[in-house]
Design a protein with these regions (language model features):
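Pyridoxal 5′-phosphate
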Residues: 1-259
């Protein structure tokens, strides 16, 4: 699942003159594997193709630099690695895009177009002030802890979790052989056990996971897990190493009760 060189070569072949833009997920939301975005972005720059990055799983735990990548856009939600409220997010723009539609604004209602001064020209209507304030605090937390520190912490927990799960009978863990290519997301499945039922059983034991196809059927098809799905565990800056053995103990207990 994680072969950076093959990924780059496959994209090089697919990057024909007809391609108007290239959109990449920095980290797989299913398997946690990190794409070689530096090389992919370089190919886009060489061919003049806009590079767009989905940093949903990487913002706050991996370096994401707009200028360094030469990206046209980088999108990220606020409620994941930035520790903000749901309903918030950021869109980083390499250049100001031309407006498709314009409307009136509360600050200059007599005009039929947005004003040309900041911040009004970017803001219309009533804003999610509480969400923005919460996102700001999340950003301050990430800045204080350090992106590299958070990322290292999450990778260490993921390695610990992957090694522990792999020792359980009947458990198949989907992970990179190179820990540096794995973020804080890990998927697994249990032979002969429905992943939805397993997720619910763990949930009853206060282990929060997500089971199924994770809104990514093509990723599951590639991995050969489309029929079964997987159980996905993820870690954050607030998880500690002592939680991993408890998770594994609860899973082992469930497996021992399996008919």
């Amino acid at each position: 699942l994680c072969r950076p060189e093959e990924t780059v070569e496959a994209f090089r072949t697919a990057l024909t003159p007809e391609v108007p833009a290239a959109v990449f997920t920095h980290v797989s939301n299913v398997f946690g594997m990190i794409l070689p975005i530096q090389e992919l972005a370089r190919l886009c720059r060489e061919r003049g193709v806009p590079f767009i990055l989905d940093a949903s799983q990487s913002a706050g735990c991996l370096p994401v630099h707009l200028e360094e990548l030469g990206a046209a856009f980088i999108a990220m939600p606020g409620h994941k690695g930035l520790y903000g409220p749901q309903g918030t997010g950021l869109l980083l723009c390499g250049q100001t895009p031309p407006p498709l539609l314009e409307g009136g604004t509360g600050s200059e209602s007599i005009r039929q177009e947005m004003p040309d001064f900041l911040p009004d020209r970017l803001e219309a209507g009533t804003h999610n002030i509480t969400g923005i304030a919460g996102l700001l605090e999340g950003l301050r937390f990430v800045e204080k802890q350090g992106v590299q520190s958070i990322g290292s912490h999450e990778r260490a927990l993921t390695v610990q979790m992957g090694e522990s799960l792999a020792q359980l009978p009947g458990v198949e863990v989907f992970r990179s052989k190179d820990p540096s290519q794995q973020a804080g997301v890990l998927s697994f499945r249990v032979s002969g056990m429905d992943c939805e039922e397993l997720g619910e059983a763990l949930g009853r034991r206060d282990i929060a996971l997500r089971s199924g196809l994770h809104c990514a059927p093509l990723a599951h098809r590639t991995a050969g897990t489309l029929e079964t799905g997987t159980v996905r565990a993820s870690v954050s800056a607030f998880n500690v190493p002592q939680e991993i053995p408890r998770f594994v103990r609860e899973l082992r207990q469930i497996l021992s009760e399996k008919p």
